[in-house]
Design a protein with these regions (language model features):
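Generic structural microfeature
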Residues: 15, 47-48, 100
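N-terminal domain-onset segments
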Residues: 21-84, 214-231, 235-244, 249-260
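Aromatic- and glycine-enriched beta-alpha-beta binding-site module
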Residues: 83-159
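Sec/Tat signal peptide C-region and signal peptidase I cleavage site
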Residues: 16-20
Length: 260
């Protein structure tokens, strides 16, 4: 493969335009096409206790903090995803709209890099999900836009109430701005079973709201809290927010290994 798979969109420098990127490898090198999805996302990354996250990885995998870009140094990603549509390999709609929150760790197994999905919260009907780590929860999203001639402020409020007592809240506001288009391939594996994996061919718009490494602080009133279960171990008060990004559009093609 001419280009190594990137573990995350957050490896991409925040101002990288699509025209400046190297061509992606042919899609048939990624595996068997299994569908596509369209979403809107908000992503936070954190630096948390290395020992805690290492113990959550599959055998043979080691922690590999994000090496560059707005999330440099982060070892945990929290994705707030609003799924708008999903189609199967035949192009027919599957599933419906859904809000979910996904936790993942950047990791390495020898030369292979990926994000290990350690936990996800979504509607009970979809748990435990493809990666086998989903937990039933009520996920509530409120988003508002105040704009004049499409210039204005967006406010988001997320809450997660897991059936096992897990709780997550996120609130933030930011000025609407022109996203940078980023196209990238990314691999995810299940922390419960690394043989369960997908590769995504992603086309997205990226707006950096906050980045400690790059000195960016455009998020307004950002508050995040997570408690209960695994969340309590990850967010024990010592965590540091590394970055926050908005992905106003996020479309991906899904590929799985031929043997899966």
């Amino acid at each position: 493969m001419r280009r190594a798979l990137l573990a995350s969109i957050l490896l991409v420098p925040c101002a990288l335009p699509a025209l400046g990127q190297a061509p992606l490898p042919p899609a048939d090198t990624l595996g068997v096409y299994s569908g596509a999805a369209a979403e809107t996302r908000t992503v936070l990354t954190f630096k948390v206790n290395d020992d805690v996250v290492q113990k959550l990885l599959p055998d043979g995998w080691t922690l590999a903090p994000i090496a560059q870009g707005p999330a440099k140094g982060a070892n945990l990603s929290v994705v707030f995803a609003e799924r708008l549509a999903t189609v199967g390999p035949d192009g027919k709609a599957v599933g419906g709209e859904e809000a979910s929150v996904i936790l993942s760790i950047p990791a390495r197994n020898n030369a292979e890099t990926a994000f290990a999905i350690i936990e996800a919260y979504s509607d009970a009907a979809t748990a435990p999900g493809f990666y086998k780590v989903g937990k039933p929860a009520k996920v509530t999203l409120e988003r508002s836009l105040r704009a004049t001639n499409l210039t204005g402020t967006i406010e988001e409020s997320w809450s997660v109430a897991g059936d096992g007592g897990e709780r997550i809240t996120l609130r933030l506001g930011y000025e609407r701005s022109q996203p940078s288009r980023v196209q990238v391939d990314s691999r995810n594996v299940s922390a419960a079973d690394a043989r369960v994996r997908r590769t995504y061919r992603i086309d997205q718009g990226l707006v950096v709201l906050a980045s400690a490494p790059n000195g960016v602080d455009q998020a307004k009133g950002l508050t995040f809290n997570a408690t209960g279960g695994l969340l309590g171990r990850l967010f024990d008060g010592s965590q540091q927010l590394v970055s926050a990004v908005s992905l106003p559009w996020y479309s991906r093609q899904l590929y799985v290994p031929a043997s899966q």
